[in-house]
C-alpha cells in the first residue's frame, strides 16, 4: 500500500507541475522580458493567435 501511495503522489505532482509550467510561461515577467524581441512575430504565427486580438494588446504594450 505504501508503494502505491507513493507512486500516485508523484504522478499527480508531475501533472500539476506540467500545468503550472505552461501557465507560468505567459505570466512570468522574466521570460517575457527576455523574449520580447521575438515573441511578437513568432507567437502570432507559431501558436495561431488571432492577429487582430494580439496586435491590439501588443501595440498598446510595446
Swiss-Prot record:
One of its GO terms (biological process) is chromosome condensation. One of its GO terms (molecular function) is DNA binding. Its main location: nucleus. This is Sperm protamine P1. InterPro entries: Protamine_P1. Protamines substitute for histones in the chromatin of sperm during the haploid phase of spermatogenesis. They compact sperm DNA into a highly condensed, stable and inactive complex. Testis. Keywords: Chromosome, Developmental protein, Differentiation, DNA condensation, DNA-binding, Nucleosome core, Nucleus, Spermatogenesis. GO terms for cellular component: nucleosome; nucleus. Signal peptide: none annotated. It is found in: Nucleus; Chromosome. Belongs to the protamine P1 family.
